[in-house]
Amino acid sequence: MVPFVIANYFPWYDLEDWTGGCTSDTPLESYNSDDSGAIARHIAQAQRAGLDGFAVHWFAPDDRTNANLSKVLSLSPANFHSTVTFLTHILPGKNQANVVDALRYLIASHTQHSNFLRIGDQPLITFSDMYRVPDEAGHLPADDAAAIAIWSAIRSHVDPAHNTIWMAEGLVPDYMSVFDGLYVYKIDHASYPEDYVKAPRWAGWVRSWEAKTGVVKYWAGTIQPGWNDLNSAKPGCEDLRVSSQPFARDRENGAYYQRTVDAVLPTQPDFILVHSFNEWIEGSMIEPSTSYGDLYLELTARHVAAFKALR
């Protein structure tokens, strides 16, 4: 397969988000995520950074993230292909049927777009927060085994023939009994500092599963420039993320970013996920900012080139 690099993209900002004190930095140009001009600018910046597409974080058909996914796809040039990170299951009040309906809608409404990301002829979809999936009654699973059973039921209703590629997020290899590969979202945090050094272990899980079953599985390596969600602990800055200790990782003028790349490249990932293009609450963005200018677009372009030179 042709190597590619995508970045997590968050399409839910309002102008007041840049003045509320919940972020550690601000974009060079303030924007509302619904603005087509801002989306077009982001696509151009991403291409300048060597990215091949976005993983657009997507909540539901009736959410603004759906309209903004459509804008990303329609505004992209022919060589920029995006997917979604599916999040319907983490919304309050959802149940298994809601997740099934949302996935059916997503596949029917978006994956046939010429700018939707594919591996071969199969659309690729990423998922996050695997253990937060509700059952038929809307209850959360007691453990990963129960979550895997729920996801298995969902896939049997939505895509039993595996016509689409589903990437699971997390550190439990058994999700590959339902999903087609693994990636890790949070590669550094307060509970497990510098967790990115475990990339060879995570890749090994995927390759071992593949060897054991004879079924092709995909490993996506995650790289990131830094992290700073300290301001998310302020009153009024709560969001849908699972509560965790606020944490900051110094970018070291790009040296930290390089270390995450150095951990991932030897694992020969099928593709790379940059976390993130614009996760401002977590402070992991490469989007041009007040503090860093466009430095991280430039560094990302170098890292993308290094990855593709190996393939």
Language model regions located:
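Glycan-processing catalytic domains of CAZymes
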Residues: 1-311
